[in-house]
């Protein structure tokens, strides 16, 4: 087992750069202003592309930096810290999926496009909320040299801005991945969803009647790579969200006064705040340990580390968001209080790819056998 957690020079540089970028481009006023936006911020997305962040994990032969997923973590963490709503995590997961499951031709066509700003969206979740392979309901039926798709996918973030989608489907009772281009989606097949996290632009994708060529099925079906990438990016976003939550809490506790004292001086508020800080440090340790072992290419260790990171982070962020609302008193329950934005993000992240109970249940046989 890997005994040393590393934090590379590249990660340090990316964390500093990404933190400053997100602080500048996603202050809370901008976050609020974009809650009802019907499009992504194209200017910010272009800047993200120009910084090379979409190519961090893409192999150099396809125009990327070849630094691996571990170096994506600081960027995703910074975006979580400032509640930045971009298609970044979906694009990174899509590129990771293509890198591990795509054919040579698919990689050569799409990976350079992603590096240059093309947006990929992951369409994996069924209407029952499941992404698990043996519960895939979407179908791909062969018809000569085409496949006809059917079914519905939910929680496809930034689907309206995507250039392509990675869709999980059943092909002759076997779970496969298909790449669907934006122009293959008929008008009216995307429906905006109302979700708890209003910084997200989430859509339902109707697959009925969509025809795709056989060569748009991915060569492989490495669902583990998708799950690992998703868990790592979610854990990074959660860790960043914890930072944002505790900053919101501490700022208010040092400002609001009651009985001629700042309320942060009262023990009943100090102790939960300290717990959140300890949870943050533990979450960050879990996160960067998971990034380290994933880079070591040890699937067994990586699964343990990633599930531990997601389980701990999910519970910690939900608690921090809840306390942030509670500490603001009656104002905390109003729409004008910024604390509720962190709670909403926490609840969204908590149930994406499994909450803490789900991952602890999967960890039990691995750790106890």
Regions found by a protein language model. Name each.
Residues 67, 132-134, 158-162:
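Short glycine/proline-enriched turns and hinge-like loops at secondary-structure junctions
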Residues 99-102, 141, 167-170, 179-182, ...:
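Short beta-strand-to-turn element immediately C-terminal to the catalytic PLP-Schiff-base lysine
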Residues 135-137, 155-156, 182-214, 219-222:
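Flexible, small-/acidic-enriched active-site or ligand-binding loops
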């Amino acid at each position: 087992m890997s005994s040393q957690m590393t934090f590379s020079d590249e990660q340090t540089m990316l964390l500093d750069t990404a933190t400053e970028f997100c602080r500048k481009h996603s202050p809370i006023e901008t976050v609020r202003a974009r809650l009802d936006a019907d499009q992504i911020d194209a200017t910010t997305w272009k800047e993200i592309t120009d910084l090379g962040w979409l190519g961090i994990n893409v192999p150099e032969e396809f125009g990327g930096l070849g630094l691996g997923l571990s170096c994506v973590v600081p960027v995703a963490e910074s975006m979580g810290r400032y509640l930045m709503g971009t298609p970044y995590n979906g694009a990174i997961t899509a590129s990771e999926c293509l890198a591990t499951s795509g054919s040579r031709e698919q990689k050569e066509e799409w990976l350079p496009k992603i590096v240059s700003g093309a947006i990929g969206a992951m369409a994996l979740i069924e209407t029952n909320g499941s992404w698990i392979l043996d519960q895939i309901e979407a179908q791909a039926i062969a018809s000569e040299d085409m496949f006809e798709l059917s079914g519905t996918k939910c929680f496809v973030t930034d689907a309206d801005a995507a250039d392509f989608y990675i869709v999980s489907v059943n092909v002759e009772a076997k779970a496969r991945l298909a790449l669907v281009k934006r122009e293959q989606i008929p008008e009216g097949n995307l429906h905006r969803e109302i979700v708890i996290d209003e910084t997200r632009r989430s859509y339902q994708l109707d697959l009925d009647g969509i025809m795709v060529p056989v060569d748009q099925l991915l060569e492989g079906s490495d669902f583990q790579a998708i799950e690992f990438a998703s868990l790592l990016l979610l854990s990074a976003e959660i860790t960043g969200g914890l930072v944002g939550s505790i900053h919101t809490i501490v700022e208010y506790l040092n400002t609001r006064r009651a009985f001629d004292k700042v309320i942060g001086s009262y023990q009943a508020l100090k102790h939960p705040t300290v717990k959140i800080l300890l949870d943050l440090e533990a979450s960050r340790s879990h996160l960067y340990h998971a990034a380290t072992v994933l880079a070591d290419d040890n699937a067994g260790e990586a699964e343990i580390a990633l599930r531990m990171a997601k389980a701990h982070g999910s519970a910690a962020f939900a608690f921090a968001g809840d306390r942030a609302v509670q500490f603001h008193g009656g104002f905390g329950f109003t729409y004008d209080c910024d604390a509720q934005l962190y709670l909403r993000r926490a609840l969204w992240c908590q149930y994406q790819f499994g909450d803490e109970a789900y991952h602890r249940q999967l960890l039990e046989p691995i750790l106890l056998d």
